[in-house]
Amino acid sequence: MKAAKNNVYTVSRLNGEVRQILEGQIGKIWLNGEISNFSSPSSGHWYLTLKDTHSQIRCAMFKGRNQSVNFRPVNGQQVLVKGAISVYEPRGDYQLLLESMLPAGDGLLAQEYEALKMKLAAEGLFASETKRALPSNIQRIGIITSATGAALRDVLHVLQRRDASIEVVVYPTQVQGTSASDNICRAIELANKRLEVDVLLLTRGGGSLEDLWCFNNEMLAHSIYNSALPVVSAVGHEVDTTISDYVADVRAPTPSAGAELLSQDKGNKAQKLALMLSRLAQGMRHYQLSQDKHFVNLQHRLNQQDPKRRLQQLEQQFDEFQLRLDNAFKHRLSRLTLRHERLSAQLQRQSPEHKLRLAHQALTHVSGRFDDAIKDTLGSAEQRLKQAVHQLEAMSPLATLSRGYSISSNANGKVITDASKVKVGDSLHTRLAKGQLVSTVIDVEM
């Protein structure tokens, strides 16, 4: 069976194409695991294995990356890493090239945030075509926030200053804590059930990622997306961006900005401008997402031809060769040690005392075998003799005599087998099993 030339791969080609598939389709990922086999050669690069109870994967973190890690990894430590799937082509090893490393626990919220963001984006919750425009004539605003928070005071102050005619309905809720997401969802549901406002403003003041975590909830994202009322998300400060900001119809950077966006000022010019700015910002965000994806693709293509990657690969090869050289030296030393021990043993075996001991052992062994052979031979001969005697006795006429028969012969010693060969007056000798008889024929019956 012949293979087509274009279907026959070289090993290098196969490993190269596998690397391109892994890097192109999987890319960068977050991974949590336990460190084992950690090593740091003189090159400054780190090599380790990440494992869990069922699997493991090799990892490499080059010097330029691991200098930003603020702790020294140790075997058995649980860590969270970010890296790109790749293949170390010279050996065909599937590995992860690490970019960052954190002790387990740190950065998990950020990881969950990115994972949820990617999931909801794939489901279409951030799509611009699903965003609704804000009403042109807003008369009543529903505010979903804490009844005692600074955000509510800021919003009311801005609305009073810009347009005191706008009515406000507050849907008080928790905006921090484990039950806050459920409370916000119920507030959105209540507002949609009553339909007493034109638009909803979801807001709270700034805080840490943990403080704002309730706004990064999947159930809340779907509640905002499914709301019949337009939703403006104004959570935190300008640098804070939550999942609710991506799902909402409009995002405002602060609570005050959200109030300004929903209020009119001097003939509605400010509202129109804010709306335009909001749409522009929204368009810029989507454009940025598109450009980020394009940048990742370009970076991937560049990495495939990047001399730096080749240099990193050569450095990794150097570390591997150095390890192999060390192992070869140890193996050579081990072989020389074994050879020395073997030669010492051979020299010991060549000593006269050792030879005499071996000769005595051999003589004892041969003598024993000789005695056994004689016994076996005599026993076999004795058995054959007994069998021959038994066969001879079985064939001997004397055996017939022992059963009551007799043998008669004439005076010449000739055995008589026919009565016609005997005359009256002949002398006969009859052999019995024990003894014999001498008789004279007085009658012959035919």
From Swiss-Prot:
Biological processes annotated in GO: DNA catabolic process
HAMAP family in the cross-refs: Exonuc_7_L
GO cellular component, as recorded: cytoplasm; exodeoxyribonuclease VII complex
Subcellular location(s) of the protein: Cytoplasm
Protein keywords: Cytoplasm, Exonuclease, Hydrolase, Nuclease
Catalytic activity as recorded in UniProt: Exonucleolytic cleavage in either 5'- to 3'- or 3'- to 5'-direction to yield nucleoside 5'-phosphates
Primary enzyme class: hydrolase
Enzyme Commission designation: 3.1.11.6
Subunit text: Heterooligomer composed of large and small subunits.
Role of this protein: Bidirectionally degrades single-stranded DNA into large acid-insoluble oligonucleotides, which are then degraded further into small acid-soluble oligonucleotides.
Full protein name: Exodeoxyribonuclease 7 large subunit
UniProt family annotation: Belongs to the XseA family.
The species this protein was found in: Shewanella denitrificans (strain OS217 / ATCC BAA-1090 / DSM 15013)
InterPro entries named among the record's database cross-references: Exonuc_VII_L, Exonuc_VII_lsu_C, OB-fold_nuc-bd_dom
GO molecular function: exodeoxyribonuclease VII activity; nucleic acid binding
NCBIfam families: xseA
